[in-house]
Amino acid sequence: EKKLNEILPLLKKEISLERQIFWICPLIDVSSNLNYTSAKKKFEQVNRLFPNQVGLIHGGIDKKIKDKVLQDFLIKKIKILVSTTVIEVGIDFPNANTIIIEDSNKFGLSQLHQLRGRVGRGNTESICILLYKNNLSKNARERLKILKSTNDGFIIAEKDLQLRGFGDILGFQQSGIKNFKFADPLPVSYTHLRAHETA
């Protein structure tokens, strides 16, 4: 509630300027095991403040309902779209200018970059707000710091790889410290290659 009240003036301003907002949550429903924001609860909170202007989509919604909500967002009937990461790819709404990501420390670096890419497709400067709870892990703090420092997808992918590790290339492990005996698959960083091309 406190975070919502702090963001409220921005929401009102964006809506008054006929711009739209994505609000991303990591969970569909409230969980007793995970202390993360749910899309359903956030929808209820935001809808109380902006009645009949808020939509909700997530992976558990029927496709027809989801398509109807997205169509209402496209024609600007809905001003704020509360969603899980189902909007991560394949969504293009140039009028959506702001994205708010709840529990941003829960997401990976590349995923945050993908989500952030849902806005900034129009002619106005976009806004990305990363919300998180206190006591961030060192790794989570580093991810958010990187995201704040660059919009370059190649640099973000490289940093993400460095943070998560390569995992097991021939196995099932998708992250972890690399264990190469003869060669490092990333001996030259993308940044160095770009600098070499420029020179």
Placement of each model-derived feature along the sequence:
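Conserved core positions of repeat-based scaffolds
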Residues: L27-D29, T37
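Conserved RecA-like ASCE P-loop NTPase motor core of nucleic-acid helicases/translocases
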Residues: F22-P26
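Conserved AAA+ ATPase "SRH/arginine-finger" region at the nucleotide-binding site
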Residues: E1
